[in-house]
Regions:
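Active-site-adjacent C-terminal substructures of enzyme catalytic domains
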Residues: 125, 163, 184, 190-197, ...
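Extended substrate/RNA-proximal surfaces in nucleic-acid metabolism proteins
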Residues: 102-198, 215, 221-224
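Metal-dependent catalytic neighborhoods of phosphoester/phosphodiester hydrolases
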Residues: 52, 82-88, 105-111
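N-terminal export signals
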Residues: 3-24
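Di-metal (Zn2+ and/or Mg2+/Mn2+) metal-binding site signature of metallo-dependent hydrolases
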Residues: 36-55
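C-terminal segment of N-terminal export signals and the immediately downstream linker at the start
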Residues: 19-40
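Active-site environment of divalent metal-dependent phosphoester hydrolases
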Residues: 47-50, 78-83, 101-103, 133-136, ...
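Divalent metal-dependent hydrolysis catalytic cores, especially in the metallo-beta-lactamase
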Residues: 41, 45, 59-82, 91-101, ...
């Protein structure tokens, strides 16, 4: 457990701390930390993106390689994994697609299908809507839905699940609500998805209860735990995070204990 906490803190700090990500690619190569050697980062945002990030994908890919990472998958809203692989050999780079409103007002099946057919086939994840999900936009309205009024998975979402199953890639819940995650993972299991992931399952406002987390695990899904909420709370460096709840390492460990 102590080793997990150390590794999680180190990995997450590298992914989300601008201070650790500063510097030019030509800087002296630091010694590889044994806790980072062979790591695969599965949830990171970098430029180019629809909002400003603290680092671009090329610089981050180079730094991950220098630090001994095996691979990195960008959670971006378009992806350039093919070019990054050609530019920075020696590290596996993957991309994905988040089905937000830039692909339409409903989950876009064709966009998901085409993402799996781009040269190299480096799309490894299709996320349900994130910052434009119906759950995130429940106060404003206009979010992209994943369930119908009766709480059933929409046909277009089922088709995306089928695409993920056929391509053997990740179907991720994005910014779906905790209740939606339980329904989505149950349907994904029924469809035959082998790699269903509940996105940042321990981070508010998408944080699952222990019962919901266990239900998703029973549905065959993996729970993704972003280390970002560890850096939230009253002592957060970023002012906007000070009013948001912190998730302690002990809480992370309690989730992981559900499926040791």
């Amino acid at each position: 457990r102590r080793e997990f906490m150390k590794a999680a803190a180190l990995t997450g700090a590298l992914a989300v701390s601008g201070r650790l990500l500063e510097g030019e690619a030509g800087a002296a190569t630091p010694p590889i930390d044994k806790d980072l050697d062979g790591v695969i980062e599965m949830h990171v945002h970098a430029d180019p993106d629809v909002r400003a990030r603290c680092i671009d994908q090329l610089t981050l890919t180079r730094q991950c390689k220098q630090n001994g990472y095996r691979g990195i998958m960008y959670k971006c809203h378009d992806f350039i994994a093919y070019l990054l692989r050609a530019t920075v050999p020696g590290i596996e780079v993957f991309g994905g697609i988040a089905l937000n409103r830039n692909y339409g007002d409903t989950v876009n099946v064709q966009a998901a299908k085409m993402a799996t057919q781009v040269t190299g086939h480096y799309c490894r994840c299709i996320w349900m809507p994130t910052y434009q999900s119906a759950f995130d936009m429940r106060k404003k309205g206009g979010g992209v839905p994943v369930l119908d009024a009766q709480g059933k998975v929409l046909p277009e979402v089922v088709k995306v699940m089928e695409i993920c199953a056929d391509a053997d890639i990740i179907f991720a819940t994005g910014h779906s609500s905790p209740d939606e995650c339980v329904v989505l993972t149950a349907k994904a299991k029924e469809v035959g998805v082998k790699k269903a992931v509940v996105t940042h399952a321990s981070q508010a406002p998408w944080k699952l209860s222990m019962d919901q987390a266990k239900a998703c695990i029973d549905n065959g899904a993996y729970l993704e735990h972003s280390v970002l909420p560890y850096f939230k709370g009253p002592h957060a460096v970023i002012p906007g995070y000070r009013e948001q709840p912190q998730v302690t390492m002990e809480e992370f460990a309690s989730y992981i204990a559900l499926a040791p």
